[in-house]
Amino acid sequence: MVDIRINEILGRDYLLCMVERPDIPTAKEKIEFIEVPGRENGSLTKKNGYEDVTFKIDFNLLEDYNIKPLLRRIKAWLLNAKTLSFTDDNVYRKIKSVEIGSIANEIEEYGQFEVTFVADPFEYAILQPLEITKTTTLVNSGTKYSLPKITIHGSGSITVTINDVSFLIKNVNSSVVIDSELKEAYSNTTPMNSNMIGNFPTFSEGANTIKWTGTVTKLQIDPRWRYL
């Protein structure tokens, strides 16, 4: 039976069941059409990313005791959702907001309710971080370019090149994190954006060759492959 996983905790851990697996829509691309007087080829288009995805899940709960205390714990678990996945797939979604509908609980041993989730437009592959110590080619299995998190272990000035696009990070002392999603470079709690030259790295669909110059012992990479 398919179960839901929120923040790495399964619904069954709360004795909770989905009525059925939800249908989750594909994110819509945000496109702006710009009319240009005299242009014969129609309007210009400006693409502005993707809309968030909204979906609903019905849950029920049936036990042989008063479930009201358990329902309070379940609500806290749902309202603090950061990630959501299902046990029949190896992807997860990043949750932005949660709304819990009215709970039908006239019988104290039974509860049924609907939850509305708003999620990031993408599905993300469930992967362990990768570790590399030499020039390596990674294959982006996703359907869009990804925004990785790269931890560089080394010292001094280091240049990292991905498919002939490079960035430089200076004054590295032991390690530095380059987070392309947050657009942040940092070492522990020290901001390092001012020490970085170049754009934050991305992984294109398909093959991505990673190499570097400088004193580096290893790179730890969370590639964040993503799918629409």
Where are these predicted regions, by residue range?
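Solvent-exposed edge beta-strands and adjacent loop segments
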Residues: 1-54, 89-103
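Intrinsically disordered, low-complexity segments enriched in serine, threonine, and glycine
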Residues: 124-228
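Oligomerization/assembly interface segments of phage tail-like spikes and tubes
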Residues: 38, 42-65, 109-122, 208
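A short, compositionally biased
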Residues: 1-2, 77-81, 152-156
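Solvent-exposed loop and beta-edge segments used for protein-protein assembly and interaction
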Residues: 49-51, 76-78, 107-111, 142-144, ...
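Surface-exposed loop/edge segments in extracytoplasmic proteins
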Residues: 13, 85, 91-95, 159-161, ...
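Short beta-strand and beta-hairpin "edge-sheet" elements
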Residues: 25-26, 83-128
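Short, acidic/charged, Gly/Pro-enriched secondary-structure junctions
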Residues: 5, 60-100
